[in-house]
């Protein structure tokens, strides 16, 4: 199944799950409100998601004078990829990480943390930037942002529904009450699994395209391992407060528990590194 169709079906599943929760809360009216809320959320995500997520992480514009290495790398690789240079931002956070956002290549931005700039060498930084540019080129940024918006909304409405309960008819029926409780408890987990299904193929593809763009798959592999290792013990408090946005980052920014790791929105680093090492056996720059 083509990735575009598969992603569309998964996003439709998220919307259906959101509407189902609305139906449990208020039957037909609740479902209609949930559908309208989902549509409005996606509309807002399309137009202002980049500004919202950048503000959420306190990202500041990176200028050439303060961050010459970063800006030069982004401009060089964007030109090589045939993309307009995205806006570049820096987040004051010790955890090395990065993400891209924006509805299309003409309205895109790349944000990196100060921890990333201090932890990676030139080749490794180029690999990370190329990875994010790949997301921009193939409009993964829009897909991941809309998915994160829906997943976050599902978690929020599930918590509200558990607190306030469903309709009177639902509360009067033990079976309906149990079924509804299961729906509300499992909905956020299901949303995370859908995020994982969308993210997995897109992260692998972005890794491969980044390696092809730079011609240095091992540099990206080293970067992924270093980011993953440091993310385990260097917290990202903003990401912990907004876990639905974790899928935007190149490496999962959440410290988490073993249970959380099982349902992380990123494919395992060891698998990503193994694929890059396999690519290194060939002249990826000619692919």
Curated annotation (Swiss-Prot):
Example GO BP: proteolysis
Swiss-Prot/TrEMBL cofactor(s):
Zn(2+)
Under Pfam families, the record lists: Peptidase_M48 (PF01435)
Q: PANTHER family in the record, alphabetically?
A: PROTEASE HTPX (PTHR43221:SF1)
- Protein's cellular compartments: Cell inner membrane
First-tier enzyme category under EC: hydrolase
Keyword terms: Cell inner membrane, Cell membrane, Hydrolase, Membrane, Metal-binding, Metalloprotease, Protease, Transmembrane, Transmembrane helix, Zinc
Topological type in the membrane = Multi-pass membrane protein
For this entry, the protein name equals: Protease HtpX homolog
The UniProt note on the cofactor reads as follows: Binds 1 zinc ion per subunit.
> GO molecular function: any one?
metalloendopeptidase activity
Q: List, from the UniProt record, the residues annotated as the active site of this protein.
A: 132
Might you give the EC number(s) for this enzyme? Answer: 3.4.24.-
**Annotated Zn(2+) binding sites:** 131, 135, 203
| Domain of life of the native organism | Bacteria
Q: Which GO terms describe its cellular component?
A: plasma membrane
Similarity comment: Belongs to the peptidase M48B family.
The UniProt entry, under InterPro entries, shows: HtpX_protease, Pept_M48_protease_HtpX, Peptidase_M48
Q: Which Gene3D superfamilies match?
A: Metalloproteases ('zincins'), catalytic domain (3.30.2010.10)
């Amino acid at each position: 199944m083509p990735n575009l169709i598969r992603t569309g079906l998964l996003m439709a599943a998220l919307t259906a799950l959101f509407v189902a929760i609305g139906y449990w809360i208020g039957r037909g009216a609740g479902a209609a409100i949930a559908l309208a809320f989902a549509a409005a959320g996606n509309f807002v995500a399309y137009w202002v998601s980049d500004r919202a997520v950048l503000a959420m992480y306190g990202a500041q514009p990176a200028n050439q004078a303060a961050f010459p290495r970063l800006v030069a790398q982004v401009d060089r690789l964007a030109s090589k990829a045939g993309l307009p240079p995205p806006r570049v931002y820096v987040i004051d956070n010790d955890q090395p990480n990065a993400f891209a956002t924006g509805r299309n290549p003409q309205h895109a931005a790349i944000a990196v943390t100060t921890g990333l700039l201090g932890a990676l060498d030139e080749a490794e930084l180029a690999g990370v930037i190329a990875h994010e540019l790949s997301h921009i080129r193939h409009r993964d940024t829009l897909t991941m942002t809309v998915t994160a918006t829906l997943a976050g909304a599902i978690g929020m409405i599930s918590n509200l529904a558990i607190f306030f309960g469903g309709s009177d008819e639902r509360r009067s029926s033990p079976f309906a009450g149990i079924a509804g409780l299961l729906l509300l408890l499992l909905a956020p987990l299901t949303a995370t699994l859908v995020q994982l299904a969308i993210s997995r193929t897109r992260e692998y593809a972005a890794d491969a395209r980044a390696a092809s763009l730079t011609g240095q798959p091992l540099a990206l592999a080293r970067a992924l391992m270093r980011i993953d290792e440091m993310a385990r013990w260097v917290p990202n408090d903003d990401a912990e407060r907004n876990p639905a946005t974790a899928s935007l980052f190149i490496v999962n920014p959440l410290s988490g528990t073993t249970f959380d790791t099982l349902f992380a929105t990123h494919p395992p680093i060891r698998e990503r590194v193994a694929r890059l090492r396999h690519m290194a056996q060939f002249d990826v720059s000619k692919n």
